Amino acid sequence: MAKVNLEQIEHAVRLILEAIGDDPNREGVLDTPKRVAKMYAEVFSGMHEDPKEHLHKVFGEDHEELVLVKDIPFYSMCEHHLVPFYGVAHVAYIPQGGKVTGLSKLARTVDTIARRPQLQERITSTVANSIMEVLEPHGVMVVVEAEHMCMTMRGVKKPGAKTVTTAVRGVLENDAAARSEILSFIKTN
């Protein structure tokens, strides 16, 4: 996949400024195309990374009980409106066969998946699927809570409304008690 084309983004931003009736040569917005291009390169940096790469570093650890990293902050851009949505991800898995990854690797996986034009539902399922594929755990549960600026600043204008999505894989799919336990851990401080 090609890297971000900064010049093309700068040109597009100038066109947007003109299209909304602003003067792209006005002092306040003169450097806006360059700033937006740099910002897009950063917020869409996940386009050029494979999230699974973060998970390949494993530790041979004889632990086959729940591992939960909760309240992982993330931001992403809604692919429908190219405005931000942000929130927290909670990632739980039950290791199998001594395949335990570093806790930061779970956070990096979330970040890489979120840093592209996205849907919250896709972030949730892609994190779960990536963990299942690379770590081959007994089970995975991912819960994502986010506020979408496309619902806050436009359209229905409902600031504070949060969307919650889940993805459950492996043994957790049929174990309501284990899912409830994970959700109770997520709720506690």
Swiss-Prot record:
Zn(2+) binds at residues 78, 81, 150. PROSITE patterns: GTP_CYCLOHYDROL_1_1 (PS00859), GTP_CYCLOHYDROL_1_2 (PS00860). The keyword Zinc applies. Keywords: GTP-binding, Hydrolase, Metal-binding, Nucleotide-binding, One-carbon metabolism, Zinc. Pfam families: GTP_cyclohydroI. Pathway: Cofactor biosynthesis; 7,8-dihydroneopterin triphosphate biosynthesis; 7,8-dihydroneopterin triphosphate from GTP: step 1/1. GO terms for biological process: one-carbon metabolic process; tetrahydrobiopterin biosynthetic process; tetrahydrofolate biosynthetic process. The keyword Nucleotide-binding applies. It is an enzyme of class 3 (hydrolase). Its EC number is 3.5.4.16. SUPFAM superfamilies: Tetrahydrobiopterin biosynthesis enzymes-like. GO terms for molecular function: GTP binding; GTP cyclohydrolase I activity; zinc ion binding. NCBIfam families: folE (TIGR00063), PRK09347.1-2 (NF006825), PRK09347.1-3 (NF006826). Belongs to the GTP cyclohydrolase I family. This is GTP cyclohydrolase 1. It comes from Bacillus mycoides (strain KBAB4).
